[in-house]
């Protein structure tokens, strides 16, 4: 299993995590059976965020997440929770427009809006196999790390909606 994921260009840590997921799926059912290719593909992948002004960094995260499993679920911060997290002048785009933009990517299977500051309640309800977050997080700090495997997406650029808005306001 490990070699399968490593050959798919996953880093060694993520390859180990996914191989572990596959072997866990195999032994959860009583009796002996061969590991099948479907055992290697986690069913539910979860990521969350504000996704205020959808940019290339968001799209890279969504594409990466979608490749990991069969179903990609996005937890989307409500307008109210976004204001608390990002400031009174946020979100820039309404919840309706943010949902529309995420749907138009054709990468997301389901979108759930959550009103809380963290998506823990939603994660407990969904019970995803894997939670994907940006590499600016540490594994132990990711909400839901006791519920699902965590994979950190390596950000290659420092693009963020906050930086985009600051640049716009500066000009």
Residue ranges, per PLM feature:
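Nucleotidyltransferase catalytic core that binds NTPs
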Residues: 13, 37-171
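Conserved post-catalytic alpha-helical subdomain immediately downstream of the catalytic base
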Residues: 1-36
């Amino acid at each position: 299993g490990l070699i399968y994921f490593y050959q798919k260009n996953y880093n060694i840590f993520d390859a180990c995590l996914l191989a572990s997921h596959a072997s866990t799926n195999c032994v959860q059912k009583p009796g002996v059976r061969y590991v099948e290719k479907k055992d290697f593909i986690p069913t539910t992948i979860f990521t969350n965020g504000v996704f205020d002004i959808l940019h290339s960094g968001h799209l890279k995260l969504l594409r990466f997440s979608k490749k990991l499993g069969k179903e990609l679920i996005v937890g989307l911060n409500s307008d109210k929770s976004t204001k608390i997290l990002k400031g009174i002048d946020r979100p820039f785009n309404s919840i309706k427009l943010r949902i529309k933009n995420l749907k138009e990517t054709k990468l997301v299977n389901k979108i759930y809006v959550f009103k809380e500051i963290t998506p823990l309640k939603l994660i407990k309800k969904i019970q995803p196999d894997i939670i994907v977050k940006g590499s600016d997080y540490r594994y132990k700090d990711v909400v839901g790390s006791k519920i699902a495997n965590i994979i950190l997406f390596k950000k290659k650029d420092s693009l963020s909606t906050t930086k985009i808005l600051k640049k716009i306001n500066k000009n």
